[in-house]
Amino acid sequence: VMCDAQHKMSKRNGDPSYEDLIREGYLTEAVLNYVALLGWSPKGENAEREFFTLQELAEIFDISGISKSPAVFDLDKLRWMNAEYMKKLSPEAFFAKAEPVLKTVITNPAIDLKAVAALVQPRCEILSDLPERVDFIDRLPEYSTELYVHKKSKTTLENSLSSLREILPVLESLEVWTNEGLYEALVALAAKLELKNSVVLWPLRVAVSGKASTPGGATELCALLGKE
């Protein structure tokens, strides 16, 4: 197995072992599935499949499917495959794996960790990515106001500040503090101000997270953080 077209994988060169991958938050099932397809391809009706259980691999393995050429270990492909396995986990199974990681960065007892897990699961590639994705929940990070400038959302520093000033009293008076209730109120505000929804929602998303990339949208984050 090669790390690139010229070099074999080697622990000495910093290439990951199975144990390293598991510590990083890859799932055993994903690693086994990926490694099984390195230098070997299934035949017949399974030729186009990419996902197999260990039992299925044992049943369909045929030595004739082994390639004579060296296989290249593509970590990006493994990340993609692991993300697909993450999505397939039941909410309970994902939470069991994610909870220990989430507890290292979220210490506020008022935060529902199961709700956090449900929000991040569809976007989680490996478990070790989670701390960076959710660290804003405990403490808003320092961030550049340039995050409010977003071409696709049509936001500028000026209209973002204006939107936030309009948003605050709406949130303060909102009684139904759910994702749906928040979204309905903010979309109504955008319509009242004759603005695109994004001109209201993007500034709020930045204001509550301090990040350009978050595990959910503005209303999902607000619902998670709670009104207080």
Regions flagged by a language model, labelled:
Residues 91-193:
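Small-residue-rich helix-loop
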Residues 23, 70, 112, 193-197, ...:
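Secondary-structure capping and boundary motifs in well-ordered enzyme cores
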